[in-house]
Amino acid sequence: MVIEWGTALYQLLAFAVLLLILSKFALKPLLGVMQKRQDMINEQIDSAEQNRKEAEKLLAEQREEMQKARVEARELIENAKKAGEQQGQEMVRAAKEEAQRIHQQALAEIQNEKDQAVAALREQVASLSVLIAQKVIEKELDASEQDQLVQEYLKQASEEL
């Protein structure tokens, strides 16, 4: 095989010219398009990363808000429980006070009735004493008759009560 140097040199020169033309007219625009595409992909990656960070931030904020809402709900429940307990205790206290008042009123009424009964009994004893004194004056009695007479009048007085 014989190498023809003239043809090889011509082909090498044609290849170099073609490479120069391609690099000037085709390769630069092609590299520009590829660079634009790479820039666009990098922008999309940056945008996606920024969106991811923003989503994580929003998620953290939502979790924080959710936690605050849970704490608030717990506080509301605790406050409602405390208010219910206080209201229950207040109702029990009011009921005890009312029972005490009714008890005191009943004791006062009982004392009043007792005082009235004692006063009535004193009046009856006084009138019986007057009657006994009249009977004694009317007739002289010995001790046994006097005891019998007092017993009769006491029996009569207890029946009237």
UniProtKB/Swiss-Prot annotation:
InterPro entries: ATP_synth_B-like_membr_sf, ATP_synth_b/b'su_bac/chlpt, ATP_synth_F0_bsu_bac, ATP_synthase_B_chain
Predominant location category: membrane
Membrane association type: Single-pass membrane protein
GO MF, any single term: proton-transporting ATPase activity, rotational mechanism
Keyword Cytoplasm listed: no
TM region(s), chain numbering: 2-22
GO cellular component labels: plasma membrane; proton-transporting ATP synthase complex
Compartment(s) of residence: Cell membrane
Pfam families reported in the protein's UniProt record: ATP-synt_B
Keywords: ATP synthesis, Cell membrane, CF(0), Hydrogen ion transport, Ion transport, Membrane, Transmembrane, Transmembrane helix, Transport
Subunit description: F-type ATPases have 2 components, F(1) - the catalytic core - and F(0) - the membrane proton channel. F(1) has five subunits: alpha(3), beta(3), gamma(1), delta(1), epsilon(1). F(0) has three main subunits: a(1), b(2) and c(10-14). The alpha and beta chains form an alternating ring which encloses part of the gamma chain. F(1) is attached to F(0) by a central stalk formed by the gamma and epsilon chains, while a peripheral stalk is formed by the delta and b chains.
Protein's job: F(1)F(0) ATP synthase produces ATP from ADP in the presence of a proton or sodium gradient. F-type ATPases consist of two structural domains, F(1) containing the extramembraneous catalytic core and F(0) containing the membrane proton channel, linked together by a central stalk and a peripheral stalk. During catalysis, ATP synthesis in the catalytic domain of F(1) is coupled via a rotary mechanism of the central stalk subunits to proton translocation.
HAMAP family assigned: ATP_synth_b_bprime (MF_01398)
Family from the record: Belongs to the ATPase B chain family.
Cited NCBIfam families: ATP_synt_b (TIGR01144)
Name this polypeptide is given: ATP synthase subunit b
